[in-house]
């Protein structure tokens, strides 16, 4: 079963014994929140990281569901692209979701280039 907590923009994938939880934070980043024993959905919240500096990137601390290459991400990325003008930075923005027949599709688009990404869950 999959359900969406609209007020917090959080998705919960539920099995008999577990929850897999991720969501879209206030800045539009996709963030992994929990995988494990079922919890009360009220317990799922985004942790804000505010002490960013040149040696410590908040994007490196965020456990993103999908980590695109670019910005201040210094760890291994899940998505890399090179656009026609040579740019290799991907700036994904959340554009919406579709939940139908217990299949979830979460959509993102690049802020500057014609790239669309959809994550699928069943």
Predicted feature descriptions by range:
Residues 1-122:
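N-terminal accessory beta-strand-rich subdomains and adjacent acidic, glycine-rich linkers
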């Amino acid at each position: 079963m999959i359900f969406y907590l609209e007020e917090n923009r959080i998705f919960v994938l539920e099995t008999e014994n577990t929850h897999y939880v991720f969501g879209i934070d206030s800045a539009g980043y996709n963030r992994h929140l929990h995988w494990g024993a079922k919890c009360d959905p009220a317990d799922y919240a985004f942790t804000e990281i505010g002490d960013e500096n040149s040696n410590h990137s908040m994007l490196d601390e965020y456990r993103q569901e999908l980590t695109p290459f670019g910005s201040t991400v210094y760890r291994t990325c899940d998505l890399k692209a090179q656009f026609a003008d040579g740019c290799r930075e991907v700036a994904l923005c959340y554009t919406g979701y579709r939940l139908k027949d217990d299949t979830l599709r979460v959509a993102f688009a690049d802020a500057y280039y014609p790239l669309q990404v959809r994550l699928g869950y069943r």
